[in-house]
A protein has these predicted regions:
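Catalytic machinery of carbohydrate-active enzymes
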Residues: 1-158
Length: 158
């Protein structure tokens, strides 16, 4: 089954979609996922075993339209974004079923639960969100030394 997923703009939100995407793959065993979104989001999830193609979003609507038209047909389109722009994008995507995250529908929940419930309701499934998971094929199997990562943070909206 061919699935097109539009990822959120923010890296943190993208990581919080991973339990929903993992549940989607478990339910739909033969999922072939195409990702599109901002470069940071696509780069984060591109190594998922079910991802067959990735596309970076061009903010220019004409270029975006051309890219979307070249993607072909999908069985399912899921957008984890709730913007008006996505409503326009949905018109250009060829998919049997199209779903867009509604920011006003899911309240008083953690973002992981919101994204998971969105996928559950869209596909009429029931699955609990699991752990956040980023697939990587670039990390060595064993570390001989301690590895420390530091995130200096980011200003909201930049």
């Amino acid at each position: 089954m061919k699935i097109l997923i539009e990822l959120p703009t923010w890296l943190g939100d993208t990581v919080m979609t991973t339990p929903a995407i993992e549940n989607l793959v478990k339910i739909i065993g033969n999922a072939e996922i195409t990702l599109f979104g901002p470069m940071i989001s696509v780069e984060t999830l591109k190594n998922h075993p079910s991802v067959i193609s990735t596309h970076i979003v061009d903010k220019n609507l004409i270029n975006l339209y051309k890219t979307l038209k070249c993607l072909g047909h999908f069985d399912i389109f899921l957008s984890f974004r709730g913007s008006l722009r996505v409503k326009l994008i949905r018109l250009f995507i060829s998919a049997e079923r199209k779903y867009q995250f509604n920011t006003k529908k899911y309240i008083n929940q953690h973002q992981v639960e919101k994204y998971n419930n969105f996928v559950n309701e869209s596909l009429d499934i029931e699955s609990s969100p699991g752990a956040l998971l980023i697939h990587s094929n670039n990390l060595p199997k064993k570390h001989s030394t301690t590895l420390l990562g530091i995130n200096p943070g980011e200003s909201y909206g930049s």
